[in-house]
Amino acid sequence: MKKIRIFATALLLAFTLSSCESFFDVELDDQAKIEDIFRQKTEVQKYLSHLYSYIPQEEEVVGMHGWTVGRSDEALFSWYQWVYYTQFRTGNYSSATTNFNYWPDYYIGINQCSIFLKYIDLDKEDTPATLAYMKAEARFLRAYYYFLLFRQYGPVFIWGDQIADETIDGKTVDRHTVQQNIDFMVGELDAIKNDLPVRTDDIGIDGKQWAGRVTRGAALALKSRILLYAASPLYNGCDLYKGQMQNIRGEFLFPQSKDETKWEAAAQAAWDVIELAETGLYDLYKDTEQTDEFTRYMSSYQGVRLKPWNKETIWGWWSRSGVYSWLGGTGGLLACAMPGMTGASGAVYQGYGGIQPSLKLVDSYPMYTTGRYPVTGYQGENDMSKPIVDPQSGYQATGFTDGYKQPGIDWGDGIKAHNSCINRDPRYYACLVPNGFWWPNKTENIKFTCYNNDACTNKWNAGEGGGITRVGYVWRRLYETNKSLREATDYTTMKTVYPAFRLA
């Protein structure tokens, strides 16, 4: 009886294994092959759209694709707990740091672009002009992803037209030189610029439906940016790299001597963009509604970001947000910059107060009357409290003025303003709200106050985790005057374009 049970068990096991094998055996003959994908116009368009998906969210202020503000010296975060940017501000990072590691993403994007270029000629449904355009787009994006690698990691390995190895290891791979990187990227852009339309409408593609697709202006602008990098001191005979860093072929990765002709090449590339703009394609954004000159300048500066796809934008994309996506791409950024307004009505109105301008940035705005920059330096290396003032600028570092009429505010009473905030360039007031100034919303009718909470914001406390303004200024660049922010939809309906390249 025992032998019968063993035999039955073995028979059942054999049947089970046979069933499993037949279940996992897949007939691949009926599976779509990559060649089949590229024979269908709609699938080709999907694949092309996918190539754009590797563009990082540079406009994001938090999360793994963001914190660019906090990593710069132009702004401050009140957030200093559970945030990644502090690793870079404090120098606490190494080759093992995983935060902000875009290396694999960009090489995957490069690989996908090369695959697209390998198979695109199988598409017999699109016109020759459209095919040429899509090829040029893929080559542009491939060059752009190399540029992003170069910008963050310096010279990298160039695959050319080969299908890139997505697992390439930045710690062990042998790199091409700076000049080889520059030559490849610029060569790609030169090769495709005439295949890219000046406008997508020129080849029958709806520019509104396909907003953000690459055009000739984008290629010229990227070339200009790359050649500017090549001419800059870091990549043009920098003493730091002399006699250092060679690849396996014995080539120095960085140029060993300065080449002044690189500035000529950079200037010519920039001029090529300007010449294209002068055909009427691009222009500086100018407000046409405000009658007061000063207010018009303020509105023009804000409109560069608040008016989507205006003529100043050469190439960009709709603003996105990862961490605060529930507030929308633009709303998420604005909410992070908005002060926590305790005196305002509407619970949603409470901003996070997480981003503030640095005092160094505040001091960089010129004076309106003289046009001179008021602060030329500081007496202490890291002490911003003792600025070196240009006496001919008209700037006053101390004292207050009573009854000052705030620019752009035609409904509020005069305020007691610090003299350092008076008679500044219109861009100053378009970007900043200093301590004691009206928040630019006549419905709320409140003032921004940084150091007490009886009017607008909570007092900064260094012991708290953030969310409170640390300096005497807050951002308002993306805040449109008098815009209501009482509901979540007031944030989500805001749509702005992030300009990767603009005429300015």
Regions found by a protein language model. Give the residues of each.
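Conserved, well-structured interaction surfaces
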Residues: 41, 45-59, 63, 80-153, ...
